[in-house]
Amino acid sequence: MQAKIIYALSAISALIPLGSSLLAPIEDPIVSNKYLISYIDEDDWSDRILQNQSVMNSGYIVNMGDDLECFIQNASTQLNDVLEDSNEHSNSEKTALLTKTLNQGVKTIFDKLNERCIFYQAGFWIYEYCPGIEFVQFHGRVNTKTGEIVNRDESLVYRLGKPKANVEEREFELLYDDVGYYISEIIGSGDICDVTGAERMVEIQYVCGGSNSGPSTIQWVRETKICVYEAQVTIPELCNLELLAKNEDQKNASPILCRMPAKSKIGSNSIDLITKYEPIFLGSGIYFLRPFNTDERDKLMVTDNAMSNWDEITETYYQKFGNAINKMLSLRLVSLPNGHILQPGDSCVWLAEVVDMKDRFQTTLSLNILNSQRAEIFFNKTFTFNEDNGNFLSYKIGDHGESTELGQITHSNKADINTAEIRSDEYLINTDNELFLRISKEIAEVKELLNEIVSPHEMEVIFENMRNQPNNDFELALMNKLKSSLNDDNKVEQINNARMDDDESTSHTTRDIGEAGSQTTGNTESEVTNVAAGVFIEHDEL
């Protein structure tokens, strides 16, 4: 998977180049096997497994108890390939299936995107796609609640592509990559590129994704060559088409085929769980369970035996769930009750039952996402849901939305928890793939270095120059906050120096580097960390 690297401009770019992958999937720190479980009836089990010698040679049958049998492939074989080879499908049938999928997919695209513009904000730029009209890139701000553009800079608007006026002339293709099938549309007739002299163009990749009832969204936009772009648009309704429904986790999972036992012989177990929910692997032995019935709530499933004792929650639990929640947010799996996809800038209180592989309740997780782009994780078996509003107790869309209270959480703050003597630990995570923590750490390092080599007067000159010609909004905000923390420390240092030597001249506006180094030892590492933690970066600036 390709990850795009971005570099955020710092106070002195030569000293601290900051980098972070944009929406890069979080790798599972503990390698866990992933499985895709499918269920067939008695007749299919006999025909496709028991009486198919090539299949039987590729794996073995395991009795799972409760009249449940499953066929598991050997590590060196692929069950899907064997089953596909055993099915006699003609080339004409396969071609017909591909053609049908493409036609139905294109119809879905027109039905769901007709006369509706969608946008995607990536730092300085906003990308807006109005199907049948244009795909543009511009600088401005978006009211995430109303979808209205605010303060659009008309001098920074670039048309990346314009679809053909005649719908019949628009060209769609059904393509395949490492993840699965998607529908591709090439849109040309964009603005002339200053570098190449050619028209800008964009390929739009329509894929299955998002919440079952959520809106269509732009997942990412990237420039693959100069003035040539790719954009991925997720449309939940495309998941109703079999070829488009398979996601990356399913492709990488080891398939298991099980015989469906009679319902009367089984209770609540993994069959009920998997047939009611779509499992999406988040890493660290944790799955996001998305219900097929939209009236049901999302759940989190734990398959890691290391997280089986919920009466003694250790730091490992928080680390693994922190990684899993980060990936859940980056994949945009959570939808608000109004259909809005939860994204950076929103705040909410979100609850989810944590269950094991047999759908047995373990505890309840509370995810509290704050306006600061930080989030708190709480575990408590006594948390209660508001039955009318799914997983949410409250939510707020962006900075412009009004907070919508959906209910009250049991023991929702530390004071209540401590008074009631109920265990409900918290763990701080970051919703932007550790970018905030990395920036805070490197700001501390730069602040400490600048205190050693630059006088307060020289620091003021540097900041004044940056204020006059800042490279972007992020740098301006970063500079102002760093300046504030540096000034506070410099004032303390000046007072200490005055007390140590009343006779020392205060008329000098510069210091020798060697002298500065000897005078800054009063800043301990803990002090630097505390100052860095106070540096706050709003989402809009990122």
UniProtKB/Swiss-Prot annotation:
Glycosylation (residues): 52, 74, 380
Domain MRH: 115-241
GO terms for cellular component: endoplasmic reticulum; endoplasmic reticulum lumen; endoplasmic reticulum membrane; Hrd1p ubiquitin ligase complex; Hrd1p ubiquitin ligase ERAD-L complex; luminal surveillance complex
Result of changing residue 223 to N: Decrease of ER lumenal misfolded protein degradation
PROSITE patterns from the UniProt entry: ER_TARGET (PS00014), MRH (PS51914)
CDD domains per UniProt: Yos9_DD (cd11745)
Gene3D superfamilies to which the protein is assigned, alphabetical: 3.10.310.60, Mannose-6-phosphate receptor binding domain
Residues holding a mannooligosaccharide derivative: 125, 137, 194, 200, 223, 229
Secretion signal span: 1-21
Subcellular location: Endoplasmic reticulum membrane
Disulfide bonds: 70-258, 117-130, 193-227, 208-239
UniProt KW keywords: Disulfide bond, Endoplasmic reticulum, Glycoprotein, Lectin, Membrane, Signal
Major subcellular site: endoplasmic reticulum
Motif (Prevents secretion from ER): 539-542
One BP term from GO: endoplasmic reticulum unfolded protein response
Compositionally biased spans, kind Basic and acidic residues: 505-514
Quaternary assembly: Homodimer. Component of the HRD1 ubiquitin ligase complex which contains the E3 ligase HRD1, its cofactors HRD3, USA1 and DER1, substrate recruiting factor YOS9 and CDC48-binding protein UBX2. Within the complex, interacts (via N-terminus) with HRD3. In ERAD-L, HRD3 and YOS9 jointly bind misfolded glycoproteins in the endoplasmic reticulum (ER) lumen.
Family per similarity comment: Belongs to the OS-9 family.
Official protein name in the record: Protein OS-9 homolog
Gene name of the record: YOS9
